[in-house]
């Protein structure tokens, strides 16, 4: 039998009957079962908001209806199923996982996805850092060009004032990398600079490919980390050194259209990858390794998690509207 701290288990959760705009986000009451073997039940104190939530809501990443959204949160473990040894009732915990369903007051989920949250890290930070922090970790530490990256190397990071971008600016600075960050306004460029970007480019005003060549003395960068997609794709390839790596990890502006692979050869024998966080956290061991490194960066003060926007769970629609309108800087969370 699971160890439990509560007997009544009803959650308020965002459930969608169909894909669509922010107006489809509505709260409903759902029954929450006891955790089975290998599962835990967690009561959320904060829920991270990410662009993947928009993809799920809009149908860009289709899910069978009815469905929930949200892939990261932080809270307190309420119940532990059979066979779970790394978590106990009362533990502060955080996670990023599939399937979606974090937009809820509590939920049951696989324990392998959940890690203990250090006392030095608040719930808002924990909820805002898991997907974005794990993404930064696998990009800067695992998604590397031939020979890896060394202090002084140039990399280009699009949307550098976003949730992932502001973490990446800080992490890159700690690694000694020369991160060139792009953003859509001067204010966002200033935010990226303040968080550690060596150089910034307002891509709404300047030709970012030309500026990258200027900054690097014509050499280009070793890696482009691109979560924007369609709008930045072509010029991003022009920013790379020969044998450089194009890491396309998102498509905020839309999917990259089909293209001729011969372009990669013509532009310098380039490498291309489309990584996802869920490949990297497929096992509990890998998840814990990533969490340990992320938490160490945060508790040491080398990376601070900017949580600039807090919304009530009932205001999830407004949170999505603001995110899609690019009105947010840094991380955003929902509070149950």
Language-model features: locations:
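C-terminal hydrophobic helical "lid"/dimerization subdomain
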Residues: 2-9, 284-336
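Glycine-rich beta-strand-centered segment in the early N-terminal region that forms part
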Residues: 7, 31-48, 58-101
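NAD(P)H dinucleotide-binding glycine-rich loop of Rossmann-like/cofactor-binding domains
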Residues: 95-159, 171
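NAD(P)H cofactor-binding loop motif with strongest signal on the N-terminal glycine-rich segment
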Residues: 159-160, 228
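Hydrophobic/small residue at the entry helix of a nucleotide-binding pocket
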Residues: 164
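Adenosine-nucleotide cofactor-binding segment
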Residues: 173-232, 283
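Glycine-rich phosphate-binding loop and adjacent beta-alpha segment
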Residues: 175, 231-302, 336
């Amino acid at each position: 039998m699971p160890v439990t701290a509560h007997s009544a288990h009803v959650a308020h959760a965002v459930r969608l009957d169909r894909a669509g705009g922010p107006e489809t986000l509505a709260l409903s009451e759902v029954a929450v079962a006891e955790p089975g073997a290998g599962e835990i039940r967690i009561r959320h104190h904060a829920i991270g908001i990410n662009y993947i939530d928009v993809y799920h809501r809009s149908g860009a990443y289709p899910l069978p209806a009815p469905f929930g959204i949200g892939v990261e949160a932080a809270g307190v473990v309420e119940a532990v199923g059979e066979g779970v040894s790394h978590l106990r009732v009362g533990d502060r915990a955080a996670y990023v996982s599939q399937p979606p369903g974090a937009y809820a007051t509590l939920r049951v989920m696989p324990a392998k996805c959940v890690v203990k949250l250090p006392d030095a890290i608040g719930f808002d930070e924990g909820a805002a850092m898991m997907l974005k922090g794990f993404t930064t970790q696998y990009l800067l530490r695992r998604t590397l060009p031939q020979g890896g990256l060394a202090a002084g190397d140039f990399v280009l990071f699009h949307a550098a004032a976003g949730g992932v971008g502001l973490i990446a600016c800080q992490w890159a600075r700690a690694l000694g990398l020369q991160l060139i960050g792009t953003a859509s306004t001067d204010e966002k460029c200033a935010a990226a600079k303040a968080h550690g970007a060596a150089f910034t480019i307002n891509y709404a005003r300047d030709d970012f490919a030309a500026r990258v060549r200027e900054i690097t003395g014509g050499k280009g960068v070793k890696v482009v980390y691109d979560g924007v997609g369609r709008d930045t794709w072509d010029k991003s390839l022009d920013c790379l050194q020969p044998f450089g790596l194009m890491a396309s990890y998102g498509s905020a502006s839309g999917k990259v259209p089909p293209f001729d692979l011969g372009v990669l050869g013509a532009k310098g024998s380039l490498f291309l990858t489309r990584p996802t966080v869920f490949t990297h956290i497929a096992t509990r061991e890998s998840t814990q390794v990533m969490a340990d490194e992320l938490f160490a960066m945060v508790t040491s003060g080398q990376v601070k998690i900017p949580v600039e926007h807090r919304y009530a769970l009932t205001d999830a629609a407004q949170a999505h509207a603001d995110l899609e309108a690019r009105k947010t800087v840094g991380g955003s969370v929902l509070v149950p």
